[in-house]
Amino acid sequence: MLFRSTTMYEYGHVKEFNIRSWRAFDASPLVDAETDTLIWPGENGLLYTIKLNTSYDKAAGTLSINPDKPVFTRYMTDLNTDPKNDLGMENSPIIVENYLYVGDNRGTYFCVDLNTMELIWAQEIKDDQNATAVFEWGEDGQGYLYLGTSMEHSDGSCYMYKLNAVTGEIVWETEWTDIVYNKNVSGGVLSTPLLGKKGTNFEGMIFFHVAKSPSEYEGVLMALDTDTGEVIWQKNMKYCWSSPVAVYNEEGKGYMIICDSVGNMHLIDGKTGGILDTVGLGSNIEASPVVFNNMIVVGTRGQKVYGIKIS
């Protein structure tokens, strides 16, 4: 328990069924409150579901769980039949209604029906995916996914996509070349893209950051057109893993906050890519910032948490 710093529950590694031996979790789990079920993709290639049997007494201030034995499965398709493939899942899943969306290390993005655990579709995206995708309901009532790949297996390129969430079909693909390969720290899209909010001046734009391009310690921030995938603007900066966030004023004018690997927090005009202000926080910022009202909060590799006020 948090207030006692004791372990409430622990589950061991599955050795016989997993596709990959690596037993870590990079993805963040999701909990379905209605069914009291935790859903968690693993780097060993297994998708876990765990009934938590949660008991919460608000008046007494008590919380307990008594998890059932985890139920897990794995997925193989014609796109990833090579036994040498590292079919782990490092990006966090998206769940919309009863459908889960997630990608694996070898360039497959797929959709699972959580009611049946059936694989609905799988789409090749050419490389590893570390960053969580973004879901959008389109003006046509259709669901769409925006996602990007890291540069782990491809030759100097990463890819940004818009997918049809029902069929998995590619609406557009934008390739970004000139990425430096580093076997210890991959380049490409390593942060979740930022989708512009409807009814604001960011509408129709999706913002990606590509790390290690055009050199080892640089990156490129760019805005793409959500309909076509065409680059609206691009800006060179230090590379980052931190995901950008947006803040909007009452008139619907948007501003972007993005943090980089040398400790800078930038306030950016999302329509042009121009830097409006920069605050130095002293060390690498790998975490993504959160915004509450006019306060930005973020942690750094320097073991400090900062609150930055927007004025």
Give residue ranges: language-model regions.
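Short glycine/acidic-enriched loop and turn motifs that connect beta-strands
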Residues: 44-47, 108, 150-155, 200, ...
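Short coil/turn segments that connect the beta-strands within blades of beta-propeller domains
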Residues: 34-36, 97-98, 142-143, 203-204, ...
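Short loop/turn segments that connect beta-strands within beta-propeller blades
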Residues: 5-9, 52-55, 113-117, 164-167, ...
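Blade-level signature of beta-propeller repeat domains, shared across WD40, Kelch, NHL, RCC1
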Residues: 280-311
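Short, small-residue-biased leader/transition segments that mark boundaries at the very start
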Residues: 1-2
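Extracytoplasmic beta-rich repeat domains
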Residues: 8-31, 60-95, 122-141, 148-153, ...
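Residue position within the beta-strands of beta-propeller blades
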Residues: 40, 102, 147, 207-208, ...
